[in-house]
């Protein structure tokens, strides 16, 4: 009879376990979009873009003009949670300032 030492690994026979590599998908991305209205001052929109989306003044002005001319403009593209947070922050700030500015998120 063979004696097995305590630290000797035991050998498995018959079954091979394969490891499958997990393929992680990148998270879904969402556009944060400002919608045009006839009441929110252009300067307020520029300030929102600078404060909440870290846009420089020139870029913020270009986005604001896109919102004004085309009815909506993309502020940035983010993961769902970040986009939802930005929409809520902008909407709350606009409401508190007495402006009807609307901010929404759309799938990118």
Curated annotation (Swiss-Prot):
Single GO BP term: proteolysis
Function summary: Involved in the modulation of the specificity of the ClpAP-mediated ATP-dependent protein degradation.
NCBIfam families named in the record: PRK00033.1-5
Domain of life: Bacteria
InterPro entries, per the entry: ClpS (IPR022935), ClpS_core (IPR003769), Ribosomal_bL12_C/ClpS-like (IPR014719)
Organism: Cupriavidus metallidurans (strain ATCC 43123 / DSM 2839 / NBRC 102507 / CH34) (Ralstonia metallidurans)
Oligomer status and interactors: Binds to the N-terminal domain of the chaperone ClpA.
Transmembrane segments: none
Protein name: ATP-dependent Clp protease adapter protein ClpS
Family the entry assigns: Belongs to the ClpS family.
